[in-house]
């Protein structure tokens, strides 16, 4: 009886390790471990009291040793069989996953059969304790010698059987670590916030993208609602249907996007030196539309450029417009031949074509918009202000005749003899190379959706004006308690690929919007960024909870997010959207 109680105690000790194997494997290991001991328990109890106690102790100790080894699948076996030794002697390197599976099938199958034989043998020994030698021979004809030896020497047989079973069980259940890892990975249940958890953790054994794509795909109804909300936010009726592979994103747009994202802006305004873009929040780039009229300008120093700006919404206000031309530095030999400073400088002039000419009847009318001086030995872009022309085009789209650009010498105003300022594509120039150097028109508009004040002023716009606690300077230092349930900012990543928008949104592929959540406990500390009204509300709630609710955890500071995308007309658009991401949270 004590031996069985000891067995139960050992099983409880190794309950954690048993989780690695299945229930069927546990039953087989348990029967194989206790079979030889259970067969000889009556023999130990039938002897004297002293011998019975010592026998019980020895049986319990041997049983504990056998079970401890049998139920520890991660321990190295004390002894190996001949097949194990021959297999380990053939190779010194760590077996691969396929080798481990093959070794498992070769070694474990016959030993599993051996366990079944031990199971049947133990049942018969327990049911027939007073067996004779002839009955044993008839029932165990294929094991006559081994069983005959055990029946004459029970103690020696018990010890040898225990050692043999312990070695066999150890060899069978020492699994390859990769097999255990694969089984654990397959049983992973990814939580809803797995993306935020993975982002906060370090490098993982598994692929972050694979886990997220396989386990966190929203259902179709959720995707439809997300798409509707984002379209309303972006002021669109439907997502654009375009071929991204045929569109080249201009380098100036990429640089402007990097400039906006790399600086802390106080509002949604897009800064542009030299232009009145203080209240602009949208930038669009346009390329020249080829037509038959281009054949009338065969020279490189004089060319007509036409830009279709119909994609600009009528409710947006134009704040600025500029024409950017690319300059290619000439060789040192050409620059050296022009020893005079006047010969190494050229003038670029841009005109608005206000009226087209009629051959033999009238000449076209031009309006000079801007002029710039450039040098031959510099490679850069030249920007020209063309806002009056674009304003006229938006008011009367049918009178958009384009721009006329000329390159002349500074002194004599004669045509420039070199291809310094790139106005048109050369005959032998590749199309891909020209796309990075072609003239571009940039328009800066305001859609009127952003507020007049800075979006960072949200923190001071509620509950108390000048008396707001967040305005108090200087603050006394406070010791923050790291409580997860108090008001704070949490991660919330928005991935545009979830709604299939990664084909027309160039950058970013997603952004962290964050959200505010948590309790506002009494009393409110300074780091909760609360107003005087929130302090009074929390005080009244503490005295009479049923009268007023607690203060709420809400965003106190918001920031804008710049997006670079393509519209239905394949126009590259850079837009700053206000109040897109949470900067700070507080109790209000």
UniProtKB/Swiss-Prot annotation:
CDD domains: TGF_beta_DPP (cd19392). The keyword Ribosomal protein does not apply. One of its GO terms (cellular component) is cell leading edge. Disulfide bonds join 487-553, 516-585, 520-587. Required during oogenesis for eggshell patterning and dorsal/ventral patterning of the embryo. Acts as a morphogen during embryogenesis to pattern the dorsal/ventral axis, specifying dorsal ectoderm and amnioserosa cell fate within the dorsal half of the embryo; this activity is antagonized by binding to sog and tsg. Induces the formation of visceral mesoderm and the heart in early embryos. Required later in embryogenesis for dorsal closure and patterning of the hindgut. Residues 156-169 have a biased composition (Low complexity). Residues 74-169, 454-484 are annotated as: Disordered. It is found in: Secreted. The record marks 456 as: Cleavage. Keywords: Developmental protein, Differentiation, Disulfide bond, Glycoprotein, Growth factor, Secreted, Signal. Expressed in the dorsal region of the embryo, and becomes enriched in a dorsal midline stripe just prior to gastrulation. Expressed in midgut mesoderm and in two overlapping regions of the embryonic large intestine. Expressed in a long-range concentration gradient in the wing imaginal disk. Belongs to the TGF-beta family. One of its GO terms (biological process) is cell chemotaxis involved in Malpighian tubule morphogenesis. Residues 96-119 have a biased composition (Basic and acidic residues). Residues 140-153, 468-481 have a biased composition (Basic residues). This is Protein decapentaplegic. GO terms for molecular function: BMP receptor binding; collagen binding; cytokine activity; growth factor activity; heparin binding; morphogen activity; protein heterodimerization activity; protein homodimerization activity. The keyword Transmembrane helix does not apply. Changing residue 121 to M: In strain: dp cn bw. PANTHER family: PROTEIN DECAPENTAPLEGIC, TGF-BETA FAMILY. It comes from Drosophila melanogaster. Residues 24-456 form a propeptide. Glycans are attached at residues 120, 342, 377, 529. Its main location: secreted. Pfam families: TGF_beta, TGFb_propeptide. Heterodimers of scw/dpp are the active subunit, dpp/dpp homodimers elicit a basal response and scw/scw homodimers alone are ineffective in specifying a dorsal pattern. Component of a complex composed of dpp, sog and tsg. Interacts with nord and gbb; the interaction interferes with dpp secretion.
